[in-house]
């Protein structure tokens, strides 16, 4: 161990140590800045996008269920996998439709105050508990019911989704704005390879769409004005609410959301700012 004979020697050593520490601190700060820039390149680059300058749009928010992912086919697939394991005889198309049909009424209980704020995972489970009885799935274990409930975390994308999102991402910030909770949307993104820049949910505003507070919360978190944000959805009601909140709107036609037997009619052209057949078509219209 080194011994010091004078206070000057100690002071000199302290100054040297402080200098080295300060150099390391500055280096770490610089590395942190570069890491942040690498993690969020669009936050610095999106204003230079030619498409952004041309359209005035800097970010796109996407409805998810039905717009980005094919929920019905995915739930049917999950049900059939379970049926093979448990030797179940269930009409999984009817099951999927019944599960989705409970979605709106369940959210209305939250909107009306009958229920406190309850996220979509819990609302899905409330609906599923009734369906277990209705469809004769009483023999399922708690773990199996929970796994089935999380099928909504494992939904598959429409064929054009990932390619279209990647093109749009090259010119704009792209993010979700769904009634699904953040953990559900994050798991879904990992499962389906969805390249979001951010995951926004009505959960953040504690108000379900079409409440305007859901849209404006996402806009505020992006530090943008409503007119700089484009809401993308396959559901006209979602887009009408977004337009009332001041956002621009893009309708994407998803005729097979409810299956081949119930092809959805296309919304009348001209109501929204953009009307597209797919995400690839929307990217083309936006110059991405």
Where are the model-predicted features located?
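Hydrophobic alpha-helical core bundles mediating ligand binding, dimerization, or RNAP-core interactions
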Residues: 75, 79-83, 99-103, 124, ...
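N-terminal twin-arginine translocation
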Residues: 19-26, 37-52
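Asp-based, Mg2+/Mn2+-dependent phosphohydrolase catalytic module
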Residues: 2-18, 30-35, 51, 181-182, ...
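Generic structural signal for small/hydrophobic residues in well-ordered secondary structure
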Residues: 63-66, 128, 176
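Active-site neighborhood of HAD-like aspartate-dependent phosphohydrolases
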Residues: 51-101
């Amino acid at each position: 161990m080194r011994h010091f004979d004078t206070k000057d020697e100690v002071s000199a050593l302290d100054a040297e140590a402080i200098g080295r520490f300060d150099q390391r601190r500055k280096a770490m700060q610089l590395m942190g800045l570069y890491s942040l820039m690498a993690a969020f390149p669009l936050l610095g680059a999106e204003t230079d996008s030619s498409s952004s300058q041309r359209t005035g749009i800097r970010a796109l928010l996407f409805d998810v269920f039905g717009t980005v992912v094919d929920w019905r086919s995915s739930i049917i697939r999950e049900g059939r996998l379970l049926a093979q394991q448990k030797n179940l005889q269930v009409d999984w198309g009817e099951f999927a439709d019944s599960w989705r049909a409970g979605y709106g009424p369940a959210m209305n209980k939250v909107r009306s105050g009958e229920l406190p704020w309850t996220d979509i995972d819990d609302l899905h489970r409330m609906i599923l508990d009734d369906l277990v009885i209705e469809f004769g799935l009483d023999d399922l274990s708690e773990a199996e019911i929970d796994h089935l409930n999380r099928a909504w975390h494992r939904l598959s994308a429409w064929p054009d989704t990932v390619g279209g999102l990647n093109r749009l991402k090259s010119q704009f910030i792209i993010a979700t704005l769904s009634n699904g909770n953040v953990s559900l949307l994050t798991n879904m993104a990992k499962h389906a390879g969805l390249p979001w820049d951010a995951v926004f949910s009505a959960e953040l505003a504690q108000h379900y769409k079409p409440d305007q507070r859901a849209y404006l919360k996402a806009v505020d978190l992006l530090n943008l004005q409503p007119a700089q944000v484009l809401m993308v959805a396959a559901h006209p009601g979602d887009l009408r609410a977004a337009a009332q909140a001041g956002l621009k709107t893009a309708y994407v036609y998803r005729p097979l959301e409810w299956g081949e037997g119930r092809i959805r009619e296309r919304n009348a052209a001209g109501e929204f700012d953009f009307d597209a057949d797919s995400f690839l078509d929307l990217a083309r219209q936006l110059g991405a």
